[in-house]
Swiss-Prot record:
SMART domains: DAGKc
PANTHER family with a match to the protein in the record: LIPID KINASE YEGS, SPHINGOSINE KINASE
Pfam families, per database record: DAGK_cat (PF00781), YegS_C (PF19279)
Entry protein name: Probable lipid kinase YegS
Domain (DAGKc) ranges: 2-133
Residues the entry annotates as binding ATP: 40, 66-72, 95
Listed Gene3D superfamilies: 2.60.200.40, Probable inorganic polyphosphate/atp-NAD kinase, domain 1
Annotated cofactor note: Binds 1 Mg(2+) ion per subunit. Ca(2+) may be able to substitute.
Length: 299
């Protein structure tokens, strides 16, 4: 096997007992690859491990976990200064793995690990909210956000992405639309939103294609708003073809401003952020990510 530069895997603590992953790492080490492994325990660990990766001089920092882990690692990488910033590798080990799935990361751990180490590093965009918090995949608001943030961990562990749908159906009687105003480049809308999706990536909530036209290297955010008076039809519309749905508003812009008369919550790659005012902007070519050659989210 050809020689490859060293990598550092930042592994979500929930995945430490993954025997197939351990075997895949040991096999690649036996083939001559240098793979450092660090395990997260609390918030902030990923950023500290990225700093360590810089000191070790690795070529790739691999995020081993779900969308939240990928978010933490990628956010830490774009905050690095100087030259020789490591590329991002992705090892999908979460509940939904929305970003990894949409960009075509293999489900097989050995194949995903090899791609994360030896794949072509391509410059991709990220998004920033209120000049602070970032997301690599999607910001979602409305009832979908409340579903994903409130779904019990045991249900997610047992059922994966389907757990979000089940929990949403259980909560139908308590979920209400959010009134807000959204502005962007050549875009303005005001009304009651059942679901808001602002995507750098395409899917969220366990496989729902909220922003099916999004690309991760076009310098744009894709916006989709599901409007209407009833929650259930909106949920159903996200599970089927909705190209002709009159209750869907779409837009594209390098930034969006959102204002609401009451507090609303956005889910940023799995992390909730609440407020009344949000400025969301794209950060073009913010980091390099190792992706398959046929990645569908590249222009």
């Amino acid at each position: 096997m050809a020689e490859f530069p060293a990598s550092l895997l930042i592994l979500n603590g929930k995945s430490t007992d993954n025997l197939p992953l351990r075997e895949a790492i040991m096999l690649l080490r036996e083939e001559g690859m240098t793979i450092h492994v660090r395990v997260t325990w609390e918030k902030g660990d990923a950023a500290r491990f990225v700093e360590e990766a810089r000191k070790l001089g690795v070529a790739t920092v691999i995020a081993g976990g779900g969308d939240g882990t990928i978010n933490e690692v990628s956010t830490a990488l774009i905050q690095c200064e100087g030259d020789d910033i490591p590329a991002l590798g992705i090892l999908p080990l979460g509940t939904a793995n929305d970003f990894a799935t949409s960009v075509g990361i293999p489900e097989a751990l050995d194949k995903a690990l090899k791609l994360a180490i030896a794949g072509n590093a391509i410059a991709i965009d990220m998004a920033q909210v209120n000049k602070q918090t970032c997301f690599i995949n999607m910001a979602t608001g409305g009832f979908g956000t409340r579903i994903t943030t409130e779904t019990p961990e045991k249900l997610k562990a047992a059922l994966g992405g389907v757990s979000y749908i089940i929990h949403g159906l259980m909560r139908m009687d308590t979920l209400q639309p959010d009134r807000c105003e959204i502005r962007g480049e050549n875009f303005h809308w005001q009304g009651d939103a059942l679901v808001i999706g602002i995507g750098n990536g395409r899917q969220a909530g366990g496989g729902q294609q909220l922003c099916p036209n999004a690309l991760i290297n076009d310098g744009l955010l894709q916006l989709r708003i599901f409007t209407g008076d009833e929650i259930l039809p909106a949920l159903v519309s996200t599970l089927k073809s909705d190209e002709d749905n009159p209750n869907i508003i779409e837009g594209a812009s390098s930034w969006f401003d959102i204002q609401a008369p009451h507090e609303i919550t956005f889910n940023l790659d799995g992390e909730p952020l609440s407020g009344q005012n949000f400025h969301i902007e794209i950060l073009p070519a913010a980091l390099r990510c190792r992706l398959p050659p046929d990645c569908p989210l590249l222009r």
